Regions:
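Well-ordered alpha-helical scaffold segments within catalytic/enzyme domains
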Residues: 15-24, 70-84, 129-147, 195-211, ...
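Structured, solvent-exposed acidic/aromatic patches
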Residues: 152-155, 177-178, 184-198, 202-211
């Protein structure tokens, strides 16, 4: 069982690469405790012996998205040295995700706790998050979790999932029907999903020998995707040449940025490019500016989404990350302070809040943003900064 109320789960927050002033550390530490308690106590549901479904919230949408679940699992893995239950919960989720979940045609938009498909729509990024969660577990635990029934190991499962990705043979880009906001894609290739594809290929390459995969082929995939991002997504922007939100790979593109597209903001954290990369910098400066149609103006304004009006905490998290990496510590501090001001006493964050007043507008229980912020506070995803390349 998770620790009871009032019992701290985490030690003092470790030094990090993101801007975190000393005066905000105690409040952020409290949010970490609350988010960790919510995942362990409310969203990581035991559905069978040795199996857990991680749902997006415990009241309104008792459904599982592989995307939301990944960021919650990332918090557990980031806290695994401090929380004795964390590794076991993630292992049980991986067993549910790869075993019980109905994956006919891939993971769909959302699944019920019994593994059945709830919303039948294919999102390319949600085929990649289960692979990353498995790789993250291997890194944190030093060993692979027990494979699902009927499988001697993980190699065949991973290889089959990787081969099934709808990657265009000419472009090297992966396509999806919907974007991470659960809205129909205007163009087939989404920037944040290609960043995620590069990251997954890079991570798989490092463990190719253990999984029986071809390291050279994975390196080639990563190189192709990185080159395609620079070649196929470039477009003019108010801060210089930037990357488009989505493209058809053959000349058409859309300039926009959404609070749901964390991988774009995380690109330097994962090592795709250094923070001083001009195209990434211009992309994120546009994302965090009123020139972006996804921006929500107001006293409490910030990055939002066409999916639901208002300022999104997921957008505030992107602002904290991007402005920290860009060296704008004053703006990074304001973004973090806004997140902590909006957070409930239990550490949870809503899906969206009013840009004029800060009042919550949607989803009072939403594990994804609080889990992501807490994982970042514990040092998740920062190792790639040391190996980032501008190539």
């Amino acid at each position: 069982d998770p620790p009871g109320p009032g019992r701290p789960r985490t030690a003092p927050l470790p030094p990090g690469r993101l801007h975190l002033p000393a005066r905000l550390r105690p409040r952020l530490s409290g949010l970490v405790d609350g988010a960790l308690g919510y995942v362990l106590g409310c969203t990581a549901l035991a559905v069978a012996p040795g199996e857990r479904c991680i749902v997006t919230d415990h009241r309104l949408l008792q459904l599982s998205w592989t995307r939301d679940a990944y960021y919650q699992a990332s918090l557990l893995l980031a806290a695994c040295r401090l929380e004795p239950h964390a590794l076991g919960v993630v292992a049980e989720h991986l067993r549910w995700l790869w075993g019980r979940c109905d994956r006919t045609g891939g993971w769909m938009r959302s699944h019920l706790p019994n593994g059945a498909v709830k919303d039948q729509a294919f999102q390319a990024d949600q085929q990649l998050y289960p692979l990353l969660e498995l790789l993250d577990y291997r890194e944190a635990a030093g060993a692979w979790p027990e494979a699902p029934p009927g499988h001697a190991g993980w190699g065949e499962l991973v290889a089959d999932t990787w081969r099934a990705l709808p990657v265009d043979p000419d472009l090297g880009l992966v396509a999806g029907e919907e974007n991470p906001a659960d809205d129909p894609a205007s163009l087939p290739y989404l920037l944040s999903t290609q960043v995620l594809l590069w990251h997954t290929a890079t991570r798989l390459r490092a463990l190719a020998g253990e999984l029986g995969l071809e390291a050279r082929a994975l390196a080639g995939t990563a190189d192709t995707v990185r080159a395609a991002i620079r070649d196929r997504f470039v477009c003019p922007g108010p801060f210089g040449t930037q990357w488009a939100y989505e493209t058809d790979g053959r000349g058409r593109s859309r300039r926009y940025h959404d609070a749901n597209d964390l991988p774009t903001a995380f690109a330097p954290l994962w090592g795709l490019c250094p923070p001083e990369d001009r195209q990434w910098s211009a992309t994120m400066r546009f994302a965090l500016d009123p020139a972006n149609p996804g921006w929500s103006p107001g006293r409490w304004g910030g990055l939002g989404s066409a999916h639901t009006p208002g300022t999104w905490p997921l957008g505030d998290i992107q602002e904290w990350v991007a402005t920290s990496l860009l060296g704008d510590t004053a703006r990074a501090e304001r973004a973090l302070e806004r997140l902590l001001a909006v957070a409930a006493p239990d550490g949870l964050l809503p899906e969206t809040y009013h840009p004029g007043t800060g009042r919550w507008l949607a989803r009072p229980w939403f594990a994804w943003p609080a889990a992501t912020l807490a994982a970042l506070a514990l040092g998740a995803w920062t190792a790639g900064l040391d190996g980032a390349s501008g190539g």
